[in-house]
Every structure is written in C-alpha cells, then in structure tokens.
C-alpha cells in the first residue's frame, strides 16, 4: 500500500500512499481512511459493549449490587492503570482473547439459563463472566486510546472523545430500550463476535506509516513522534526535534503542574460523594407509591456534557487557561450546594451530580491541553487523564443503577 521515496527523512515521513499525485500533500488515501475509520468504529463498539455490560447485565439478578460495585470500583481502578507502550501489544492481545471467551461464555449462560436463576435474569456465574469480559474490554479500550489521549492533534483527540462518549452512552442507555431478553442476548452475542480478538490498534496499523504518524496511533508499536506536538497537524512540516522519551521513564509526573492532585481527585471524590447522597435519596424514597428515583438523571448526565462543551468553547475564546479557575469555582459551588441540601435536597442532588460530570470532563480537556504541550510527560500522565475520563462513566453507571429498579417498577405498574 505504501512506499518510501525519501528514506533520509526522520520518522519515516518519506513513506506515502500509492495511487495518485496527492500522496505527498498529507491527504489520506482511501485505504488509509478505511483503516482509520475501522479503528474508530472498533473504539465505538468496545465502548458500547462496556456500557451495555455495565448497565444491563450487571444491574440485574440477585447479586446486582455487589456486581455493580465491583464493576464501578474495578473500572475506575483499571482506567488509571499504566500501559507502557513498549509492552502493550501482548497483554492487549491476551485481553482481547479473554474478552471474546468470557463474553461468549456469559452470553451462552445467559441464553440457556443458569440453574436457580429466573429466565432472562443472569445468575452469579453469568455475572462473573460478564464482569471479567467488561474488565478485559476496558483494558483493550484503554490501550487503544492511550496514544490518542496523549499526543494526538486536537481534532483527533476531540473525535476520539466523541466516539468513546457516543459508544458508552449508547451502551449505557440500553436499559431504556425494553427489548426482549432473548433479543438482548442475540445483540450482545453479535457485538462480542464482531469484536473478536482484535483491537482498534490492529486496524490503525494497516494505514501507511505516514498516516499512522499523522494520527499518532502507532505509539503502541513504535517510539512516540519526536516533533513538537503543536506541529503534529502539519505532516509535511516536522518542527524542531524533541528528546526521545521511548524506553525511559520520566522522573517527573508531568510538566506545568498538569497532574496536580487537586486536578485529578477532586472531581472523582465529589462525584462519589454525589452518588452517596443519591443513594440516601433512593433509600429515603423506597416507600414512595410511584415514580422513579432520580427520574431526571439521564437529562442531568447529558446536561453535564453540554456544560462541558460550552466551557470548552469559552476556553477557546479565552486568552488564558481556565482549568484551575474553574476548579476553584466548582469548589465554591459545592459549598453553596451543601447549604441548599437543607432547603431543596432534590435539586441539590441533581446539581451535585451534574456539576460532577461537568467538572470531570472539563478537567479532562484541561489536563489534555497541558499534556499536549509537554511531550516528556510520560505514560503515567496519559493514564491519569484516561482514568479520570473512564471514571466519569463508571460512576455514571453506578448512578444509573439507582434509577433502573424504580423505573422498571413504575413501567410495570403503568
């Protein structure tokens, strides 16, 4: 598909796609576009699978609470797990196989029925297999987005966020489809079989080296680009060379304070606190004759995303970085919100949950801006960014579990 006509240029930039006169101007050829599109489709499918398992399979059955807790805690922890680029391929391949085997076994047990479990309701063995498949899918997904989260050009990073957010949202909303359990099992089987034992990196690697470098998706197979990241969107202009960071660990976490503890843990801790308050509200309304607990949670979750998008637009127009000022504003908002808990507790819970979604995504985007300016940040910084992003959705699934039983009861009564 590709050949090189300038072997002396660093980074293999002389390699270009065959098939036209436009191979030298950086425009992707059809084969490369197809490979990259398949890679992003794979990202979306993995995220949708993770959302589906987290919201449907694990939130039913006699051990739903324990399994949901294991899913949330495990997903949050695995999201922060470092994946060194030099050793990422073999574990990813193993996880892809585990995802297929565990997911297939879970679907088989779910369809055939487990001893002692009602029809259509997963038993403990099914839930354990599904949990293992979810963990494996998360590890593969985390490895696939690792280079895209760290040094990818801004449009590609935003596209990656959109693809993963879309997949997680589609999968997480499966509880509201109200499809027959057999249809749900068939859909899950199709997704598991479609993913197979491959990862998005397998599709990305089929693009030519020039376009792999342009998309910064070959970091799991080769050293990171040694060019200034601000020039990454101009494939024909390489910019100044930077010191190589491959096969060596940076002595610092990241530069310019990009991984300050308050930037990472305040959103996660406040989200966990919001969930605790939501759980108290759920327990307090158990005796209610009708109506779901937290009926507006999906709208609040989407509203948090919309607020993060508007904040990012304001950041684009602002002359300085707003990441830290927004964090302090959020802390002040929480102080006021705690006072509202004694006056309008329902609104305060929603405000706390929506604010947690907003500040978490805002901090992800802010941290990524800082990491993009510091290519010597190291894999721990990318893992921190990635983990915070996945934590938003792991905790979002936990909030959704509080909604589902009451909504199901409300639907049956209607």
Curated annotation (Swiss-Prot):
The chain crosses the membrane at residues 39-59, 61-81, 96-116, 121-141, 148-168, 184-204, 339-359, 383-403. InterPro entries: Herpes_UL43. Residues 225-253 are annotated as: Disordered. Keywords: Membrane, Transmembrane, Transmembrane helix. Residues 228-237 have a biased composition (Basic and acidic residues). It is found in: Membrane. Signal peptide: none annotated. The keyword Transmembrane applies. It is a multi-pass membrane protein. It comes from the Viruses. One of its GO terms (cellular component) is viral tegument. Belongs to the alphaherpesvirinae HHV-1 UL43 family. This is Membrane protein UL43. It comes from Human herpesvirus 2 (strain HG52) (HHV-2).
């Amino acid at each position: 598909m590709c050949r090189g006509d300038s072997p002396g240029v660093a980074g293999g930039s002389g390699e270009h796609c065959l098939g036209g006169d436009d191979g030298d101007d950086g425009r992707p050829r059809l084969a490369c576009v197809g490979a990259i599109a398949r890679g992003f489709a794979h990202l979306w499918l993995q995220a949708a699978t993770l959302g589906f398992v987290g919201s449907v399979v694990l939130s039913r059955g006699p051990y739903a609470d324990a399994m949901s807790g294991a899913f949330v805690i495990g997903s949050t922890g695995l999201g922060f797990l470092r994946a060194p680029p030099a050793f990422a391929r073999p574990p990813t391949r193993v996880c892809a196989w585990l995802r297929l085997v565990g997911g297939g076994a879970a679907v088989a047990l779910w369809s055939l029925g487990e001893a002692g479990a009602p029809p259509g309701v997963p038993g403990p063995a099914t839930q354990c297999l599904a949990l293992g498949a979810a963990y494996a899918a998360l590890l593969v997904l985390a490895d696939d987005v690792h280079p895209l989260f760290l040094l990818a050009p801004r449009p590609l990073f935003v596209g990656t966020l959109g693809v993963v957010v879309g997949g997680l949202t589609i999968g997480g909303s499966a509880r509201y489809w109200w499809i027959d359990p057999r249809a749900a099992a068939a859909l899950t089987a199709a997704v598991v079989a479609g993913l197979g034992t491959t990862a998005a990196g397998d599709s990305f690697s089929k693009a030519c080296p020039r376009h792999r470098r342009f998309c910064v998706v070959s970091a799991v197979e080769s050293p990171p680009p040694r060019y200034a990241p601000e020039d990454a969107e101009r494939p024909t202009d390489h910019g100044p060379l930077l010191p190589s960071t491959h096969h060596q660990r940076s002595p610092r976490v990241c530069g310019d304070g990009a991984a300050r503890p308050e930037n990472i843990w305040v959103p996660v801790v406040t989200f966990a606190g919001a969930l605790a308050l939501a759980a108290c509200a759920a327990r307090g309304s158990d005796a209610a004759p009708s109506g779901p607990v937290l009926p507006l949670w999906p709208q609040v979750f989407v509203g948090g995303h919309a607020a993060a998008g508007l904040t990012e637009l304001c950041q684009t127009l602002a002359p300085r970085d707003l990441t830290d000022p927004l964090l302090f504003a959020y802390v002040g908002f929480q102080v006021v919100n705690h006072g509202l808990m004694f006056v309008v507790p329902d609104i305060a819970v929603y405000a706390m949950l929506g604010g947690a979604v907003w500040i978490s995504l805002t901090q992800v985007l802010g941290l990524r801006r800082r990491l993009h300016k510091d290519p010597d940040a190291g894999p721990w910084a990318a893992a921190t960014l990635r983990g915070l992003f996945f934590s938003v959705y792991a905790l979002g699934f936990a909030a959704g579990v509080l909604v589902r039983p009451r909504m199901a009861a409300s639907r049956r009564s209607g």
